[in-house]
Amino acid sequence: MAEAQKLHEEKPRSFRREDIPAKGYTYKDYLTWGDDVRFELIDGIPHMMAAPTLWHQRVTGEIFGQLRNWLEDKPCEVYVAPCDVRLFPEADKSDRVVVQPDVLVICDEEKLSDGKACRGAPDFVVEVTSKGTKGKDFREKKALYEKAGVREYWVVEEGAVYKYAPVDGEYRETVYDLDEDSEISVDMLPGCSIDFKKIAEFASRG
């Protein structure tokens, strides 16, 4: 009981540098924090995740739904946040990166074998931006997904989609204006595309 209380008290509630251990937190630490507050762990530093807006939830849910329908009876699986992803897993749980992408597709069932998290890079990741996450989506998380080997990464914001896929080992960006490109193909899933006209109609509801 005392140990459980100690772990609860050690849960990071602020992001002042002086409160964070010199080596940062690990996945092993992350597992002690519980579910009452959602965090991502980036290079050992906890980042609190704010409650999403209705627009964010509608867009995320519709992308997930379209992918789920397309992937029916196919070997890959699609998940929606919160779903922990250990991009650089270590056997002793000392890895210092745990993210929760908005939508992710995993084609290697071995990465899901522990039933708790995706161990290793998903094949396809979608992040839907918000005011609080936009910078992180385009910088830190893009760099992490590229390094980990995510085959395709999208950042979705109102009016545009930014697609990243590796060319000669580095992500190349393609930008889609949703006023002109209402249907965007998922390159790593040949034949699959996301209908953003349908998403816009759903997301704009009052």
Where are these regions (language model features)?
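Gly/Pro/Ser/Thr-rich low-complexity, intrinsically disordered segments predominantly at protein N-termini
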Residues: 1-206
